[in-house]
Amino acid sequence: MNNIAPQSPVMRRLTLQDNPAIARVIRQVSAEYGLTADKGYTVADPNLDELYQVYSQPGHAYWVVEYEGEVVGGGGIAPLTGSESDICELQKMYFLPAIRGKGLAKKLALMAMEQAREMGFKRCYLETTAFLKEAIALYEHLGFEHIDYALGCTGHVDCEVRMLREL
């Protein structure tokens, strides 16, 4: 009898070969929540199919979660465009339904914020939408506080929930 244990999810840095897979995850999760490209959500970002190129720049980092050979989620950090140089943004945190509830988003967010600290950032900002209740609960648990105004120039005009955390 051959008992092969299922693989554990692996968190690793984004590679060029991951571009199509992580774009697919972001589009699928966005569709699940009704976050359409005609509005100011991540799914409308012009660089969605080129995330490796974006996150290979200094001050940027992105990780994917791979499970049984498939990319099932990801998230990253980048300097907050149009804001103070000590503020980064937690970006593009998306996970397929089958992998949610396993603590991976929390682990990834903590890892990203630690990397941001090491890069010299002092604060971490994020934008999301009220449709993503589970994500908001996670961010609150991680110490993010709601703020009443947008920071920077993210282009995500329909993301009405804005949060900030000291690193």
Swiss-Prot record:
InterPro entries: Acyl_CoA_acyltransferase, GNAT_dom, NAT_camello-type. The keyword Transcription does not apply. It holds the Pfam family Acetyltransf_1. Signal peptide: none annotated. One of its GO terms (molecular function) is N-acetyltransferase activity. Disulfide bonds: none annotated. Belongs to the acetyltransferase family. This is Uncharacterized N-acetyltransferase YjgM. It comes from Escherichia coli (strain K12).
